[in-house]
């Protein structure tokens, strides 16, 4: 690993980022953080039809929510001149050649190859075209797309995740780098950018392993330094299906809007499918210390929303007041009550936003459920005077128990129903002082208060 690595996350702004995109983004950012390196956000927006400014803005917003602040940023759409220069170099070297087949012609050719038991790779027929042949095709209105001529050899590298790896480029079609309309596909701009800014480590999903064989040859053809490569396992759904931007409920935006903590999403996205126990890690620095690419599993990493729920709850239960003070204020909790309220309710929350429900129980109005009127009337007469404190609930229930003989559930449940309207919730020794004597007395009397 270089002394000061430069890594990159390069999404296409063609949809909202999902939990599967969070994995490479975080692995790269944490890798750089651990090694004192830098993180580049590059928008691969060469797909002019599908790339939108809305999705580009959402990428930055989602990364910020995860706690990732890029050190460098650029868009590929602003760097076309660099790609043009590289393409001309490859043409001059005989490595980029024009092809004129239509998609339909290529499809028929592939079917014939399969029918003869041959691998369906491009047969380089365009290399046999003469100048006159090409002129005739262009006179028909055809415009060439451009393929990179691969050396038919094995490309090997020491993968940061998988160890010794290789791709036999003889088994691959020469990849199209430039479309007939002159726009670039992913491969050439990616290599040019990595070379130009000095990316040292390319950390990405294992679905890019084959691309690495092609890209290594491109780096070589352009006379550029070859970065280290690492290909991590992919997140899948709990059923083992691949994630895509079409799964809106697993988009980072939807998870944020649903009230999940970024630390819970980070922890699950990074630790799932690793040698580390999957657990909530609140600190980015601590999470970075746990990232060891060589200890990632080769098996798919299954993302289970139920596991996210549990992890989020564990984080919320341990959150100090300072971490949620502003959010509690936004939910309507007065500053003077926030400390006692948060201490009372946090162990009952799965998400911070659920605190709003318990503040409504405290401040009202609550319609009491008086299931045993005689018992509640006797309990109301024994209600201590104000002010209430942490010992009020025990003193009161001891007195009610002595007066009525009720104990256990028969003692506590009717009181909980009358005071909160619910059969579950935080410890009433903590909640009762927040409710206060006046509201408690009115609820015990059957009033909505």
Curated annotation (Swiss-Prot):
Q: Which InterPro entries match?
A: aa-tRNA-synth_I_cd-bd, aa-tRNA-synth_I_codon-bd_sub2, aa-tRNA-synth_I_CS, aa_tRNA-synth_I_cd-bd_sf, Glu-tRNA-ligase_bac/mito, Glu/Gln-tRNA-synth, Glu/Gln-tRNA-synth_Ib_cat-dom, GluQ/Sye
Record's catalysed reaction(s): tRNA(Glu) + L-glutamate + ATP = L-glutamyl-tRNA(Glu) + AMP + diphosphate
| A GO CC term attached to the entry | cytoplasm
Q: According to its UniProt record, what is one Pfam family this protein matches? A: Anticodon_2
Q: Which family does it belong to?
A: Belongs to the class-I aminoacyl-tRNA synthetase family. Glutamate--tRNA ligase type 1 subfamily.
HAMAP family tied to this protein:
Glu_tRNA_synth_type1
Provide the E.C. number(s) assigned to this enzyme.
6.1.1.17
Q: How does it assemble?
A: Monomer.
| Compartments, as annotated in UniProt | Cytoplasm
Q: Which positions does the motif 'KMSKS' region occupy?
A: 242-246
Keywords, in A-Z order? Aminoacyl-tRNA synthetase, ATP-binding, Cytoplasm, Ligase, Nucleotide-binding, Protein biosynthesis
Sequence motif 'HIGH' region, location on chain: 11-21
Query: Where is it mostly found?
Result: cytoplasm
Which GO terms are recorded in the biological process aspect for this UniProt protein? glutamyl-tRNA aminoacylation
Q: What is the gene name?
A: gltX2
Molecular function (GO) terms listed? Answer: ATP binding; glutamate-tRNA ligase activity; tRNA binding
Residues engaged in binding ATP: 245
Q: Could you tell me what this protein does?
A: Catalyzes the attachment of glutamate to tRNA(Glu) in a two-step reaction: glutamate is first activated by ATP to form Glu-AMP and then transferred to the acceptor end of tRNA(Glu).
* Stored PROSITE patterns: AA_TRNA_LIGASE_I
Protein name per the record:
Glutamate--tRNA ligase 2
Q: Does the keyword Nucleotide-binding apply?
A: yes
Keyword Ligase on this protein? yes
């Amino acid at each position: 690993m270089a002394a000061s690595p430069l890594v990159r996350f390069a999404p296409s702004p063609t949809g909202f980022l999902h939990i599967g995109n969070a994995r490479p983004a975080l692995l790269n950012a944490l890798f750089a953080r651990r090694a004192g390196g830098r993180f580049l956000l590059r928008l691969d927006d060469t797909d002019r039809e599908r790339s939108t400014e809305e999705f580009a803005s959402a990428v930055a917003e989602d990364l910020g929510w995860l706690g990732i602040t890029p050190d460098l940023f650029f868009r590929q759409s602003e760097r076309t001149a660099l790609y043009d220069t590289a393409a001309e170099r490859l043409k001059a070297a005989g490595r980029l050649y024009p092809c004129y087949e239509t998609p339909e012609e290529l499809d028929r050719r592939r079917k014939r190859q399969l029918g003869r038991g041959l691998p369906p790779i491009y047969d380089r027929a365009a290399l046999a075209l003469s100048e006159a042949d090409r002129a005739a095709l262009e006179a028909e209105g055809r415009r060439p797309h451009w393929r990179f001529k691969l050396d038919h050899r094995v490309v090997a590298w020491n993968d940061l995740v998988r160890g010794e790896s290789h791709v036999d480029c003889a088994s691959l079609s020469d990849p199209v780098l430039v479309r007939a309309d002159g726009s670039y596909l992913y491969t050439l701009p990616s290599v040019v950018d990595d070379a130009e800014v000095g990316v040292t480590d390319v950390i990405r999903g294992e679905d890019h392993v084959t691309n690495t064989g092609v890209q290594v040859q491109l780096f070589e053809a352009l006379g550029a330094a070859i970065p280290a490569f690492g290909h991590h396992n992919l997140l899948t759904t709990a059923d083992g299906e691949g994630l895509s931007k079409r799964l809106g409920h697993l988009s980072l935006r939807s998870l944020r809007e649903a009230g999940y903590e970024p630390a819970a999403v980070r922890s699950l996205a990074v630790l799932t499918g690793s040698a580390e126990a999957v657990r909530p890690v609140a600190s980015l620095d601590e999470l970075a210390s746990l990232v060891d690419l060589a200890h990632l599993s080769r098996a798919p990493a299954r993302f289970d929303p139920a596991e996210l729920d549990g992890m989020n709850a564990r984080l919320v239960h341990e959150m100090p007041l300072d971490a949620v003070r502003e959010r509690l204020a936004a939910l309507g909790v007065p500053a003077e009550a926030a400390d006692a309220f948060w201490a009372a309710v946090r162990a009952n929350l799965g998400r911070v936003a659920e605190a709003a429900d318990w503040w409504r129980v405290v401040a009202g109005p609550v319609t009491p459920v008086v299931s045993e009127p005689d018992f509640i009337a006797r309990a109301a007469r024994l209600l201590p005077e104000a002010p209430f404190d942490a010992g009020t609930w025990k003193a009161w229930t001891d007195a009610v128990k002595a007066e009525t003989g009720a104990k256990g559930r028969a003692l506590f449940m009717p009181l909980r129903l009358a005071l909160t309207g619910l059969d579950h919730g935080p410890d009433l020794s903590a909640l009762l002082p927040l409710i206060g004597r006046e509201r408690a007395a009115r609820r015990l009397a059957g009033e909505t208060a």
